[in-house]
């Protein structure tokens, strides 16, 4: 069991974590026709918007109530009212997801009461879902905001089943964690459909942030799960929660609708995917398709090939708790040592990470301990690239944001195929780094000062130079 330690510094230097409001807004982006709204100052929203645009390279729907100094003191009712009216009139969304920020949380705005007043004053908003989630950015992290938003969606949007309501055993709810990419969700959807199951993802980022060009412009999200489909999730046969962060949302779903659930804390690795495949075979009543048996064999072969390069490595990882747990488990299976583990917030899984200590800290902590313990592989998001350069170690980018590489939304790490790809990517990074920095080459052989650096035979002194026609 890992020892979890809290930071003792008076401030955060080079932050690792992203804030709760951004995580909450990210969850609402997986709903069709949605408009996430941050109840706070313009700066809060513009900073988050910049991160999303740089990560996905897409147009991102995100609005603000634009709280000023005066509004912050007197209360944000008028700002929230005006923002909702403007959005409903101009963007015509199917749902508005409202996330609080540190400014409005500190002031103590009762947003739930505000929404009741707004609905009573404007009958045209009666049928427009307004979902509010409390996400103060002075505590918690990105994963906490996502977790709260999804649980709140289940509470507000999912209908209770009728007394004689029938369940569809082939219909499955999937509650993915924030550490999964749109590419991961596409992979999971194909996998579930191969078992004859019909999945409903909440949220479904694969439909809205997968990088496709829509037929026509819309200022809201261009895809995702529809509000009507969310309402019918109570008629599913099972709920699959991916990541420990989704335990709460799955419990809310079961309490409200009676749908049983199972949590899969990891889907990157051989044994976690074996368990996942067996579960899908059990609930569908179908054998595991031969294509996945072949993919399993390919993953086993990839692990054999790559363990020469990954096994024994000292790894430093900085990530959200579920992503840290997922990657560290896979690397441990490959024989690597997770020597430094830094995360952003508390979670029940971090105590079970196979390392001596997990620090809730920042990138300065990650770099400092990686240097102290002589780590030779660094894994975190793009803000860790300078640390990797100073440490002169291979750098594998994961999490959010990844803004200095393309295709962040299409990375796949789930399933046999996704795990195989991650293993190859990390092993190739290690090989390339060794070739560039450690392997001797002819231009490094002559390192003694004074020796000629040119290649070729030496002419005798005084001999005339002959030209070659």
Curated annotation (Swiss-Prot):
Superkingdom: Bacteria
Region Disordered, residue ranges: 435-469
Residues annotated for [7Fe-Mo-9S-C-homocitryl] cluster binding in this entry: 44
Gene3D superfamilies registered for this protein in UniProt: 6.10.250.1090, Nitrogenase molybdenum iron protein domain
Keyword Chaperone among UniProt keywords: no
PROSITE patterns according to UniProt: NITROGENASE_1_1
Pathway in which this enzyme or protein is active: Cofactor biosynthesis; Fe-Mo cofactor biosynthesis
Alphabetical list of InterPro entries matching this protein: ChlB/BchB/BchZ, Nase/OxRdtase_comp1, Nase_comp1_CS, Nase_Mo-Fe_CF
Listed Pfam families: Oxidored_nitro
UniProt KW keywords: Metal-binding, Nitrogen fixation
UniProt GO molecular function: metal ion binding; nitrogenase activity
Disulfide bonds, paired cysteine numbers: none
GO BP: any one term: nitrogen fixation
Record-stated family: Belongs to the NifD/NifK/NifE/NifN family.
Matches recorded under NCBIfam families: nifN
Role, per record: This protein may play a role in the biosynthesis of the prosthetic group of nitrogenase (FeMo cofactor).
Name of the protein described by the UniProt record: Nitrogenase iron-molybdenum cofactor biosynthesis protein NifN
Protein source organism: Bradyrhizobium diazoefficiens (strain JCM 10833 / BCRC 13528 / IAM 13628 / NBRC 14792 / USDA 110)
């Amino acid at each position: 069991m890992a020892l979890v330690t809290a930071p003792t510094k008076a401030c955060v230097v080079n932050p690792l974590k992203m804030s709760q409001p951004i995580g909450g807004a990210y969850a609402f982006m997986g709903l069709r026709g949605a408009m996430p709204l941050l109840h706070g100052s313009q700066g809060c929203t513009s900073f988050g918007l910049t991160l999303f645009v740089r990560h996905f390279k897409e147009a991102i729907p995100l609005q603000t109530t634009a709280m000023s100094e005066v509004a912050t003191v007197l209360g944000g009712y008028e700002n929230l009212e005006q923002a909702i009216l403007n959005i409903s009139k101009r963007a015509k969304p199917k749902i508005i997801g409202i996330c609080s920020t540190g400014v409005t949380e500190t002031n103590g705005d009762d947003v739930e009461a505000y929404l009741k007043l707004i609905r009573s004053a404007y009958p045209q908003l009666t049928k427009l879902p307004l979902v509010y989630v409390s996400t103060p950015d002075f505590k918690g992290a990105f994963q906490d905001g996502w977790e709260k938003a999804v649980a709140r969606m289940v509470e507000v949007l999912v209908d209770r089943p009728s007394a004689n309501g029938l369940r569809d055993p082939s219909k499955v709810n999937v509650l993915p964690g924030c550490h999964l990419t749109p590419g991961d969700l596409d992979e999971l959807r194909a996998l579930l459909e191969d078992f004859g199951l019909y999945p409903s993802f909440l949220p479904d980022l694969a439909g809205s942030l997968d990088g496709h060009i829509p037929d026509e412009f819309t200022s809201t999200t261009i895809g995702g799960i529809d509000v009507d489909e969310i309402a019918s999730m109570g008629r599913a046969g099972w709920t699959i929660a991916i990541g420990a962060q989704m335990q709460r949302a799955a419990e809310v779903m079961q309490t409200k609708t009676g749908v049983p659930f199972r949590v899969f804390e990891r889907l990157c690795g051989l044994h976690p995917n074996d368990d996942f495949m067996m579960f899908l075979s059990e609930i569908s009543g179908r054998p595991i398709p031969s294509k996945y048996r072949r993919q399993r064999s390919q993953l086993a072969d990839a692990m054999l090939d790559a363990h020469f390069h990954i096994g024994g490595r000292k790894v430093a990882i900085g990530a959200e708790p579920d992503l840290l747990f997922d990657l560290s488990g896979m690397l441990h299976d490959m024989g690597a040592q997770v020597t430094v583990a830094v995360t952003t917030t508390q979670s029940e899984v971090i105590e079970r990470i196979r390392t001596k200590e997990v620090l809730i800290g920042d990138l300065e902590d990650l770099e400092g301990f990686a240097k102290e313990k002589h780590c030779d592989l660094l894994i975190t998001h793009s803000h860790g690239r300078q640390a990797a350069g100073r440490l002169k170690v291979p750098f594998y980018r994961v999490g959010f944001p990844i803004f200095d590489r393309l295709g962040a939304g299409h990375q796949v790490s789930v399933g046999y195929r996704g795990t195989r790809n991650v293993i190859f990517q990390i092993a190739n990074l290690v090989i390339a780094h060794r070739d560039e920095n450690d392997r001797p080459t002819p231009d490094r052989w002559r390192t003694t000062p004074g020796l000629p650096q040119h290649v070729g035979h030496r002419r005798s002194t005084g001999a005339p130079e002959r030209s070659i026609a």
